[in-house]
Swiss-Prot record:
This is Lytic polysaccharide monooxygenase-like protein X325. Disulfide bonds join C71-C176, C141-C195. It is found in: Cell membrane. Keywords: Cell membrane, Copper, Disulfide bond, Glycoprotein, GPI-anchor, Lipoprotein, Membrane, Metal-binding, Signal. Residues 1-24 form the signal peptide. CDD domains: LPMO_auxiliary-like. Belongs to the X325 family. It holds the Pfam family BIM1-like_dom. It comes from Aspergillus fumigatus (strain ATCC MYA-4609 / CBS 101355 / FGSC A1100 / Af293). Binds 1 copper ion per subunit.
Length: 239
């Protein structure tokens, strides 16, 4: 499908990347994200190998902010986005940094205004494959991400959605959006403009097997990836 929005928007983002203002990684385009954490500054030597350090009264992130658990170096926001009490859409741009032609995506939920952890998986992890190992445009969207199992919320409750993208070398990028649960009628409408899947990005399943020589995947393995297939089918149906 044709990528929505203008090419000029992507060009502007690439310009920021090249200017050194952003050594970018992952962006949650719907329902939004905590804030601009696409920053890389300072050197590894200045931080003594740490992901964050204070130098001359300023905080540096030599590897980039998004490598920092749990939300890419961004604090909790008071400007929360409304999200449906029964679950809703999540759209991501995964190709903002080199090394992400293949990646695993995790989507978790943390409950409360300032969640003590992000230990509630919303969907099984899934793989994406992009067109190149260099930065690339494109969006993926899951139109109906459910609440974690055995989770009950009501309108007005606070939570944080965490998106993790693990690169092929195992390093993880973190991004979050702080939400307030609301009735669907109070939530920004999901459309083909804010929730779509770019044709240059494909999905892959993640499953376990007891034998690499088996001619067919075990039934339990197939059942374990069924939720991902269902979400992917819903996604492509919206294209």
């Amino acid at each position: 499908m044709v990528l929505p929005s203008s090419v000029s928007q992507w060009a502007a983002l690439i310009a920021l990347l090249c200017a050194g203002l952003a050594n970018a990684h992952t962006v949650i385009t719907y329902p939004g994200y905590r804030g601009n954490n696409l920053h890389t500054n300072g050197t590894v030597e200045q931080s003594n190998g740490l992901g964050q350090a204070e130098v001359n009264g300023s905080v540096i992130f030599p590897y980039g902010m998004e490598w920092m658990y749990p939300c890419g170096g961004m604090p909790t926001t008071t400007n929360r986005t409304k999200w449906p009490v029964g679950g809703g859409a999540i759209a991501i741009q995964p190709g903002w940094f080199q090394g992400h032609q293949t990646a695993l995506i995790y989507i978790n939920l943390g409950l409360g205004t300032i969640p003590p952890n992000m230990s509630h998986p919303m969907v099984p992890p899934f793989q994406i494959t992009g067109p190149t190992n260099d930065p690339y445009p494109g969006t993926i969207c899951l139109p109906q991400v459910p609440l974690p199992a055995n989770t009950s919320v009501k309108p007005g409750d606070h939570a944080t959605i965490q998106v993790i993208e693990t690169a092929k070398h195992g390093a993880a990028l973190y991004n979050c959006v702080d939400i307030e649960f609301a009735e669907p009628s109070e939530v920004e409408e999901v459309t083909r403009d804010n929730c779509f899947n770019s044709s240059i990005i494909s999905f892959g399943e993640v499953f376990t097997t007891t034998s690499l020589t088996s001619a067919a995947a075990p039934k339990s393995s197939l059942m374990s990836v069924l939720p991902v297939y269902m979400v992917a089918l819903l996604s492509w149906a919206m294209m």
